[in-house]
Amino acid sequence: MYKTGILNSDISKLLSDLGHTDEIMIADCGLPIPNGVKKIDLALDFGKPSFLDVFHIVKSHMAIEKMTLASEMKTENESLYNVLKEEEIKFTTESHELLKQHSKHVKAIIRTGEAKPYANVILASDVLF
């Protein structure tokens, strides 16, 4: 058993296997998961665990080059948008429909219990050297 770090074995393995520019997604409980994409389901109840709880834990263990958000987040979930834009990570936005199409190409989607709209982010892995 790990003394520190991510205890969820699926997430730990996912992060260990990432190469430069590989992408993962952290999603709210309503995002449709595309066929063929690995789903790591953490959702226990509405809001539990929250998007931000999962995001901050993953961020502390992953080298992130950039993140992609739904452009609708800026107006439909402004509080989350404001938190994410303050992170020291480059980010781009695309429509929610494009983000759902983009999700077909990620290595895995980590499903949270978040029940607020547009609480989804695609994280592209960076390289440490």
Curated annotation (Swiss-Prot):
> Which keywords are on file for this protein?
Carbohydrate metabolism, Cytoplasm, Isomerase
Reaction equations catalysed: beta-D-ribopyranose = beta-D-ribofuranose
Q: In which pathway does it act?
A: Carbohydrate metabolism; D-ribose degradation; D-ribose 5-phosphate from beta-D-ribopyranose: step 1/2
Q: Which cysteines are joined by disulfide bonds?
A: none
**Which GO terms fall under biological process for this protein?**
D-ribose catabolic process
- GO cellular component labels: cytosol
EC no. given is 5.4.99.62
Q: Does the keyword Oxidoreductase apply?
A: no
One short Pfam name that applies is RbsD_FucU
Against InterPro entries, the record matches this protein to: D-ribose_pyranase, RbsD-like_sf, RbsD_FucU
Active site location: H20
Its subcellular locations are: Cytoplasm
Entry's Gene Ontology molecular function annotations: D-ribose pyranase activity; intramolecular lyase activity; monosaccharide binding
Residue positions annotated to bind substrate are D28, H96, Y118, A119, N120
Q: Does the keyword Cytoplasm apply?
A: yes
The entry assigns this protein to a family as follows: Belongs to the RbsD / FucU family. RbsD subfamily.
Q: Tell me, what does this protein do in biology?
A: Catalyzes the interconversion of beta-pyran and beta-furan forms of D-ribose.
Q: Which PANTHER family match?
A: D-RIBOSE PYRANASE
Spell out the NCBIfam families in the cross-references: PRK11797.1
Subunit description: Homodecamer.
Q: Tell me the protein's name.
A: D-ribose pyranase
Q: Which organism is it from?
A: Staphylococcus saprophyticus subsp. saprophyticus (strain ATCC 15305 / DSM 20229 / NCIMB 8711 / NCTC 7292 / S-41)
| Organismal lineage | Bacteria, Bacillati, Bacillota, Bacilli, Bacillales
